[in-house]
Amino acid sequence: MSFQEIRILFDNGLVKTPVGVLAETNGRVLFEYDSAWVSGGVELSPFHLPLAEQTYRFESGRLPDRLPGLCADSLPDGWGMLIMDRHFMRQGIARNDISPFQRLAWLGDEAMGALCYQPSLRSSEALLEAIQIGVTAREAIQLFEGRILAAGRLLARIGGSPGGARPKALIGCAPDGVNFVSGAGSLPEGYSHWLVKFSASRKSITSEYGRYEGTLEHICLAMAAAAGITVPESRLIDDGSGVWHIAVRRFDRPSPSARLHSATASGLLHADHRLPSLDYADLLKLAWSLTSDMRHVLEQYRRAVFNLFVGNRDDHAKNHGYLLDGNGGWGLSPVYDVTFAGGPGGEHYTAYLGEGRQPDISILLKLAEQASIKAADARLIIGQAQSAVATFSALAKEQGIPSGLRRQIEKQLTQIGSSVCGKR
């Protein structure tokens, strides 16, 4: 089924409001806001689709996902794309023939954030099904490692929307914290929306790093919180086989039925997240332009500093997020996808004033100066990040990270600290 036109709606959990229409013709993508949405005054994409009663035109080949960033943010990354591609392949549609509009229609009402798309290829019934984490994890890992060719019906529904490369699923957590249901749609009262990431490596679930991937991200979030960064609630779930998976509470779903609009730097700036397309100077400017609030600028600076000291080089444009509150105000979302991760050629996806491999403290201080952050505040933030990362060894021991893997990461963190601040 092909589509030349997709309707975009805003779903706050109570009512769906028309936002606009997306169309494609002769290699161009066209977008028009609904006039009532323009009158409402809520800016969803202020830099590339500012509110106006006009037709926006884009050359589809010049857009990172052949869609305006407002809609491209709804598309998943590696894992969700894998599930989506396998679905269309079973319908006889080759990967290269899947249109962006078909992908949006496949997401339908179940995209992350508050946007939904019509017509939808999804069933309108939002069935709640009990989930066994171990069973779902095994299926997800087998698909991820190529041992099965397609996701089952339930995994396709709860695993096809989230972004990121790792296998994951949307779940609803019961008040008792031990029972789970499918979490793509609304949940019963008392339940909460979570995203569970299944620990796995590309080689084997028995590889050491793969088995502890979720635990290591859980540790990174604890260190980020200690560095003064806003983090989502997270917990570790045992699947019964000795592998722990990290579950993160969804910040775009603050209650069983409510939804918040989310956006990334990639979508807001039309920056390709597959390439090293941004600098932290860009993100600091974005924080001020979008929020006019120095608190968010300082928070963005904290994240830049922490990503450097913790060795999170997978800091691409989709890993910097924003939320739109119920009053139409923007703010940074809680941090996500923060862990020990490599980048292109050993560099950060997001550079520090053009330096991606070995930024040092002088660059961090200059970055702060350009963002009108006082040197004393910058040094305090740098010190807090260093102190937080220094707790890794104790946290890793507490969480049962094997000594060999722990020492390997400790060595990497020490090398980064020496590179940034100089050997002592």
Give the location of each predicted region.
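Phosphate/dinucleotide-binding and metal-coordinating scaffold of catalytic cores
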Residues: 1-317, 321-424
